[in-house]
């Protein structure tokens, strides 16, 4: 296969949703149909004690929530599929944001009973800002749900994107029996699922005009379907490929990830419509995926994927050129040459060594601490720099220190590694030895921090909540002693030695700004390429 053909067959996408919409389950079912796994283990199925393939960290298995982004790959129908499974919990929006920076399209998962929820809105906004195509999968249609017309209206009003249903749920008053495929004018009815969604199912199919289908559905349901089809054809948005690619129209699919219903048709249509790797803006130029000069963007760092070795793996998305095992590349931020040995690809904790990879692919490489999230790797002869990722301002703060002072070294190492991952933001208060101030966007992050330090580094934490909810970065050099009105604030340094003011609330911050008119306070720190 030529280099160009390899690039064109890549599909790299992220799945975004509110917690509990069924994201991890959908990810698993896509892997099931892609042949990457042969038996899907439901997160919630306690009987078999199976855990979702993409939830690999111990705390995720226990709680049934995704707190790290997994990277999963499989081949289907000639396409090489890279799924970026993002954290569903709202406290991990920063990790999710970074993952979306590595995706070429997004699948928005919506619970048919709940519609558009808070986290979906936030993640949708990020996807829209990136200008990537967004596909909608309305999940759980095997349960009682809202009217699909209501959902279409809600998506259009709340998210500001037009919808085009590719299939349509068949039923009356929120009780659905199957789906109608609009393009092929066929009906597919739910099959009775005795395997609880662990295996692929054959379902009952037939043409809309098939008398047997009318008989199976019953007169009332069949007539309701005909009425819905007519209304959709007259009042709905027609399918427009260019609008989908521009992120102005979202193709809608209905199904049930738990029972595998509608997953295969969705996967096939999605792969047909979703884009191959897109050009990416660097500071110097627009980088074309078909360029032969290698470039990659670090979007995630994960410490301790193998708890026995305390390893640190840097995940990068290849943006251009062909990757070959053992190749040497330039790390732009340190200007050092790095040899990329032992590159890996993952199905959760299952690793395979990669010989080569192409634009759109995600690979993980071992790193001793040189690279950071948002860094660029490129060919020596053709230097490019991708822009940094934004930092989400933390809203919760705590001072953490080791209960056992003899574990100071493990504490320092653990905190540094977890901060490099972006799991939390850490700050140091001058003079406060053996402790860090930790900033998070949600309380669950503190729980995960405590859990991981204990389980991965053997450190029990002392955790004291601090009375601050606002962080402001000071732009430029300022004599801290001359700042006015900061008696009740805390002055700290972030991991890049930038000065940060932590203060109790926005009103107090406004007062400090008034007292210091010559000082610029930033909500987020300036990025590398803005300096």
Model-derived features with residue positions:
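Structural and coupling elements of P-loop NTPases
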Residues: 1-531
């Amino acid at each position: 296969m030529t280099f160009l053909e390899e690039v064109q067959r890549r599909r790299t996408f992220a799945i975004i949703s509110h917690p509990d919409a069924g994201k991890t389950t959908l990810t698993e079912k896509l892997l099931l149909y892609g042949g990457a796994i042969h038996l899907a283990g439901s997160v919630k199925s306690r009987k078999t004690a199976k855990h979702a393939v993409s939830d690999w960290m111990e705390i995720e298995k226990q709680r049934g929530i995704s707190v790290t982004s997994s990277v999963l790959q499989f081949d289907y129908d000639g396409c090489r599929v890279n799924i970026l499974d993002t954290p569903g919990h709202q406290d991990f929006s920063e990790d999710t944001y970074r993952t979306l920076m590595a995706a070429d399209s997004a699948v928005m998962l919506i619970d048919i009973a709940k519609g558009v929820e808070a986290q979906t809105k936030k993640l949708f906004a990020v996807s829209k800002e990136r200008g990537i195509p967004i596909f909608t999968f309305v999940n759980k249609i095997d349960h009682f749900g809202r009217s699909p017309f209501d959902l279409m209206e809600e998506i259009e009003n709340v998210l500001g994107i037009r919808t085009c249903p590719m299939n349509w749920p068949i039923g009356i008053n929120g009780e659905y029996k199957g789906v109608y495929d609009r393009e092929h004018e066929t009906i597919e009815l739910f099959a009775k699922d005795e395997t609880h969604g662990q295996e692929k199912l054959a379902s009952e199919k037939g043409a809309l005009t098939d008398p047997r289908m009318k008989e199976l559905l019953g007169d009332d349901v069949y007539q309701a379907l005909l009425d819905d089809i007519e209304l959709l054809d007259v009042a709905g948005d027609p399918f427009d490929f260019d609008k989908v690619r521009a992120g102005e129209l979202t193709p809608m699919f209905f199904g049930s990830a738990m029972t595998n219903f509608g997953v295969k048709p969705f996967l096939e249509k999605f792969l047909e419509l979703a884009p191959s790797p897109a050009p990416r803006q660097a500071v110097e130029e627009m980088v074309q995926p078909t360029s032969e000069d290698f470039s990659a963007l670090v979007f995630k760092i994960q410490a301790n994927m193998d708890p026995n070795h305390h390893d640190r793996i840097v995940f990068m998305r290849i943006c251009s050129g062909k990757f070959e095992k053992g190749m040497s590349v330039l790390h732009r931020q340190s200007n050092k040459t790095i040899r990329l040995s032992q590159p890996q690809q993952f199905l959760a904790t299952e690793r395979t060594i990669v010989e080569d990879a192409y634009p759109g692919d995600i690979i993980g490489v071992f790193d001793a601490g040189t690279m950071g999230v948002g860094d660029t790797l490129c060919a020596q002869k053709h230097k490019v720099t991708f822009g940094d990722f934004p930092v989400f301002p933390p809203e919760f703060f705590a001072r953490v220190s080791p209960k056992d002072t003899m574990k100071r070294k493990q504490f320092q190492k653990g905190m540094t590694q977890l901060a490099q991952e972006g799991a939390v933001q850490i700050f140091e208060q001058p003079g406060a030895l053996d402790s860090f101030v930790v900033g998070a966007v949600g309380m669950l992050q503190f729980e995960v921090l405590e859990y991981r330090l204990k389980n991965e580094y053997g450190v029990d934490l002392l955790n004291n909540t601090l009375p601050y909810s606002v962080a402001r970065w000071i732009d430029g050099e300022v004599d801290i002693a001359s700042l006015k009105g900061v008696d009740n604030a805390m002055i700290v340094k972030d991991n890049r030695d930038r000065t940060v003011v932590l203060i109790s609330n926005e009103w107090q911050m406004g007062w400090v700004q008034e007292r210091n008119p010559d000082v610029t306070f930033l909500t987020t720190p300036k990025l590398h390429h803005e300096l």
